[in-house]
Amino acid sequence: MSKSHAAYIDYALRRTTNMPVEMMGSDVVRLKDYQHFVARVFLGLDSMHSLLLFHETGVGKTMTTVYILKHLKDIYTNWAIILLVKKALIEDPWINTILRYAPEITKDCIFINYDDQNFRNKFFTNIKTINSKSRICVIIDECHNFISKSLIKEDGKIRPTRSVYNFLSKTIALKNHKMICLSATPIVNSVQEFTMLVNLLRPGSLQHQSLFENKRLVDEKELVSKLGGLCSYIVNNEFSIFDDVEGSASFAKKTVLMRYVNMSKKQEEIYQKAKLAEIKTGISSFRILRRMATTFTFDSFPERQNRDPGEYAQEIATLYNDFKNSLRDREFSKSALDTFKKGELLGGDAIAADISLFTELKEKSVKFIDVCLGILASHGKCLVFEPFVNQSGIEILLLYFKVFGISNIEFSSRTKDTRIKAVAEFNQESNTNGECIKTCVFSSSGGEGISFFSINDIFILDMTWNEASLRQIVGRAIRLNSHVLTPPERRYVNVHFIMARLSNGMPTVDEDLFEIIQNKSKEFVQLFRVFKHTSLEWIHANEKDFSPIDNESGWKTLVSRAIDLSSKKNITNKLIEGTNIWYSNSNRLISINRGFKGVDGRVYDVDGNYLHDMPDNPVIKIHDGKLIYIF
């Protein structure tokens, strides 16, 4: 049915031929062609009530949305605009962008923070105040977070956000309102998020049905046929976050480096105690204590079970103060720092105090040592992602920075009042090379919505639970024109994953999470392909054989058809002759996967999903006695 969708896209474009390509307020910006295209389609089809902007980080989905909001009154006079946004993103980019390019809509905007514990009450209170003659346009920024907060918990409890989700799914189309969902990573943790998002955009279209069988989509064609026009898809980098990507005129080159570091004996000792403590307390599935132990360890492991919280907190504070005091008036000499900046370690002829300090710091954290050395050797500015703020996280890392003489800013929950200004200073043209501020260390608070410019190295100290979060983190630094001020030879970003290892070769929590991420991505890749093939851009580019229409009366019927996956008509079992192979998507063998090569040259993954054809002259490397194909 994509031909039918193509006819409506064509109709919308014909209706909006005179829509300006520039947006003017106190400043002027000219939209990119892809931004102007999606705005024209969404505004040109008044009955297109909802749309997902699946745009990768840094391509301007906020700007696209503000342009749409600015032109809402081209199709109807009275609008109330409700923006559901994370608190950290309300001021920048949303309010700043609106004030700069569309100040006239400010009076119509209502910002509500969906992180607020009173979000539900605030939302419905605001809904009641809206004039009955006004149409509503709802914007859900980083909609994957909103969806995640709307999922029913494992214990069956319904979260407060769910009532807002239910209201929107029932009301938007019924009352002739509009809604735009924005995300660079619309699926983060589970396939259920895809179902939730589809039913928010197209209510009732995807009932309780199993989407996968043996990790393969049951009927991809049915999904694509019924979900046409669901989204706008602007993803220039479809590679895995662990793959290298060549640069372009607008985007910096990305190189991935896996930095494996062996934990010190002290760290290994604490790591094993942390593992045992997780088992005793029943929280081993979260791996929190082990993740913290791979990052930094005090001289002892503070047990938390069966203890007064105040007593436990006091012990942590004492350990922290003892470590902080041990570094008082201590720092590396200029000669040591000069050595580190060359990418070298201290030699036997180094100053004794430098060697002693380095040894002490390394015993407690090989990761922090590795990051500090990497920052000093970097030719430009750096980002460091550390999800933990207190105890063994950012609070400790900043002590390391002080000893190594690394200038920095912090973007975390501790710096809510100063972090926006600090990032602005970090991004200033005068700091392009990191002369004033070398590094920004950020927690999950800085994983979405903010932009960094002229970054050359990102250090990721702790694996997240999913590839989507890693994409968001890396996407803070690789954005459209983010390196325009950087010298041509430095228009690159090295992404360093710091992975801790045990001396006995057993997998650490870092390696466990790496495997979890890879397993999740197998299903997500197939769902992302559905988004791509149902997008306005794909349909417009690939469906040319349609009959033009002169009204949009049939659009609602077209997009309201229920999806039926019961027939499972595309699942067929075939016995293919061939051989088992090993393959990797990286020249540095970041991840090595099992696969299968058929006699016809087609290559499949371990679950039987077709990947691509074997090249005529494949690149092969030998690793641990295995032949590894590089694709």
Swiss-Prot record:
Q: Where is this motif: DEAH box?
A: 141-144
Q: Which GO terms describe its cellular component?
A: virion component
The protein's gene is named OPG123
- Every Helicase C-terminal domain range: 367-532
Q: Which GO terms describe its biological process?
A: DNA-templated transcription
Give the protein's recorded name: Nucleoside triphosphatase I
Mind telling me which Pfam families this protein's record contains? Answer: Helicase_C (PF00271), NPHI_C (PF08469), SNF2-rel_dom (PF00176)
EC annotation?
3.6.1.15
Any idea where this protein resides?
A: Virion
Drop me one GO molecular function for this one. DNA binding
Catalysed reactions, as listed in the record: a ribonucleoside 5'-triphosphate + H2O = a ribonucleoside 5'-diphosphate + phosphate + H(+)
Q: How does it assemble?
A: Interacts with the late transcription elongation factor VLTF-4/OPG110. Interacts with the late transcription factors VLTF-1.
Query: Where do the annotations place ATP binding?
Result: 55-62
